[in-house]
Amino acid sequence: MQGGNQPVDKSGQTIERMFSAVAPRYDLLNRLLSANLDQRWRRKAADALTLANGAPVLDVCAGTGDQALALRKRTPRVLAADFSVPMLRIAHRKFSRILAPKPAGFASDTLQLPLPSKSLGAITVSFGLRNVADLDAALREMHRVLKSDGETAILEFALPRSDLLRKPYLFYFRNILPRIGGWLSPRGSAYTYLPDSVMQFPQREEFTRRMEDVGFRDAHWHDLTGGIVCLYTGRRDS
């Protein structure tokens, strides 16, 4: 994978502090920097799941709860986990505005989920796996809590494969996005970190191979919006 110049710091304390600092402006920046496409991508992830067994569904790295809300439109039993308490507070405010049953949010590190093995029907993560300190450990933990034949849907930023899109995308990612983030966020460094973390993240075939290595089957990837985002899906073995 084409990387940034230096490995990004993904220690739990660094990531937690960064996202807690940007929490008040996080939704505004998501809408602005994605041209409001982030909500559409989250719906795509929710719609990629069959949710056939009626078991609870968990969104990890849940942030301010938008993916959990997209899931709630598909199924009543939704959980949302994130280790940033300021992010979760915003998520809880959103959950309080919808009819019961509401998503249940709780503080947790994706690497150590406080859930029994084989307890979930599905698990999702949107734009969060590139922030974990140990990607393979996170995938193993996601696999652990899924029931047999349970599903996963993972959204992550990607580099467009087309040169026509890649060059303007990289210019925006490296030059414009960090400036906008710096103007609007008290922690502008989060938006310098973003392009570096994307460029160092395994993509497409490499990522689905990592999914298969921890036990997922039927691992597939699907480009969204010209390949700037990738949707990955898979299942736990029966």
Residue ranges and their predicted role:
Residues 25, 35-55:
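Conserved alpha-helix/loop element of class I SAM-dependent methyltransferases that forms part
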Residues 136-151:
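A short glycine-rich, Lys/Arg-flanked "PGG" loop and its adjoining helix->strand segment in the class I
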Residues 1-25, 173, 184:
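N-terminal, positively charged/glycine-rich alpha-helical extensions of SAM-dependent methyltransferases
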Residues 13, 158-210, 220:
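C-terminal alpha-helical "lid/dimerization" subdomain adjacent to the S-adenosyl-L-methionine
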Residues 56-112:
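Class I SAM-dependent methyltransferase SAM/SAH-binding core
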Residues 111-122:
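A short acidic, Gly/Pro-enriched loop at the edge of an enzyme's catalytic core
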Residues 121-135, 158:
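A short SAM/SAH-binding and catalytic strip from SAM-dependent methyltransferases
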Residues 208, 214-238:
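Core SAM-dependent methyltransferase catalytic element
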